[in-house]
Swiss-Prot record:
It catalyses: 2-deoxy-alpha-D-ribose 1-phosphate = 2-deoxy-D-ribose 5-phosphate; alpha-D-ribose 1-phosphate = D-ribose 5-phosphate. Mn(2+) 2 binds at residues 291, 296, 344. One of its GO terms (molecular function) is phosphopentomutase activity. Its cofactor is Mn(2+). This is Phosphopentomutase. CDD domains: PPM. The gene is deoB. It is found in: Cytoplasm.
Length: 397
């Protein structure tokens, strides 16, 4: 084992330019060929990221205001996605060695099909309102009072592959809410309707001005269809620590310690705390704010500020790393906040590998699949590998 601990941070949606197959992916009828999340954010504002610059992010692609530097303790490149799809679950599963060959369904522009909703109404005995892509807080303002009067289910989606059901805890008891959501999960297992997650979204309050979502949210995710690098690590008794939404993305499969995060800031603080602890294995963090708060909302300045905030937290994390630790920064897809539409964009993702033990650094060739990350981690811990991906461990000198 070369590295006792591997810290893997997924900067959710921070792509570095359209992939070769971006012409097959679309936002409101426009293909993704001109997308470049990181590049376009830098062009739209004064982006100052000294720590990412030192690590070599400006060596991966041209980023306005960020220099290409001589690398002494980091290796950088970009990675192409092999799976079909450009969503969070697909990207993360591929990182850990599982390809998605049938994309998860999204219903952002159309809402859910009538047949699906008819079956949900029939099996739950309740009518459905909403059926649009919406912000969870905004839809409560629009439909919460109607739901309280009628008991109808507020069903909505987002740019992700998800079906969400908002229900008031005093109108529909929480256990009944979970039963309704389990029915929705069963219905959405069919290939034509298969969504990555069904989410119960309970709320309380008396009117549209004071509705508030409660902590009784419940996710009905899809378990990965095959074992991933996470399983092989945990089966070999290594620590697999999932921070943020990682546990939900993998439905807990192969994970033996986890905690949620409330923000990117919280995520960076949590991973820094783990760096101060003794463990052997993988600590895996997703920074979701980039995607959820800024990418989908097409807010390049908010996105850029979030990158700068993360950049400012890197030194403390890195100061707590040991000689035999490896830090990897990457992403799971793109979400160009300057692009048309509100959906993800099909892009290459960055890869930065840093260790205090590196004697040199430099640029690696483009990696052919996100699964090279999982393969490298498996190689390091000498555990079974998935059938996808090639390790680049030997290239890290």
């Amino acid at each position: 084992m070369r590295f006792k601990r591997v810290f893997l941070i997924v900067m959710d949606s921070l792509g570095v330019g359209a992939s070769e197959d971006a012409n097959q992916y679309f936002n409101e009828g426009v293909d993704d060929t001109k997308a470049n999340t990181f590049g376009h954010i830098a062009e739209s504002m004064d982006l100052r990221i000294p720590n990412l610059e030192k690590l070599g992010v400006g060596n991966i692609i041209p980023i306005k205001g960020t220099k290409s530097v001589e690398l002494s303790s980091s290796y950088v490149t970009k990675i192409r996605e092999k799976s079909l799809g450009k969503d969070t679950m697909t990207g993360h599963w591929e990182i850990m060695g599982l390809y998605v060959t049938t994309p998860f369904q999204t219903f952002t522009d159309t809402g859910f099909p009538k047949e699906l909703l008819d079956e949900l109404e029939e099996r739950t005995g309740r009518k459905i309102i909403g059926n649009i892509a919406a912000s969870g807080t905004e839809i409560l303002k629009d439909l919460g009072e109607e739901h309280m009067r009628t008991g109808d289910l507020i069903v909505y989606t987002s740019a992700d592959s998800v079906l969400q059901i908002a229900m008031h805890e005093e109108i529909i008891p929480i256990e009944e809410q979970y039963r309704i959501s389990a029915i929705a999960r069963d219905i959405t297992m069919r290939p034509d309707w298969k969504v990555g997650r069904v989410i119960t979204r309970p709320f309380l309050g008396t009117n549209k001005d004071n509705f508030k979502r409660t902590s009784n949210r419940k996710d009905y995710a899809l378990k990965p269809s095959e074992e991933t690098t996470l399983n092989f690590l945990s089966d070999a008794n290594y620590d697999v620590i999932a921070l943020g939404k990682i546990n939900d993305i993998f439905d807990g499969y192969g994970i033996n310690k986890y905690s949620k995060t409330v923000s990117n800031d919280d995520g960076m603080k949590q991973i820094t705390e783990w760096a101060k602890k003794d463990f052997t294995g993988l600590c895996f963090l997703n920074l979701v704010d980039f995607d959820a708060l800024y990418g989908h909302r097409r807010d390049p300045h908010g996105y850029g500020k979030a990158i700068m905030d993360m950049d400012s937290q890197l030194p403390e994390l890195m100061a707590n790393l040991n000689e035999d630790d490896l830090l990897i920064l990457t992403a799971d897809h793109g979400n160009d906040p300057t692009y048309v539409g509100t959906d993800h964009t099909r892009e290459f993702v960055p890869m930065i590998a840093y260790s205090k033990s590196f004697k040199s650094g430099g640029s690696l060739p483009i990696l052919n699949t996100f699964a090279d990350l999982g393969s490298t981690i498996s190689d390091n811990f000498k555990v079974k590998k998935t059938e996808h991906g090639d390790s680049f461990l030997s290239k890290l000198k």
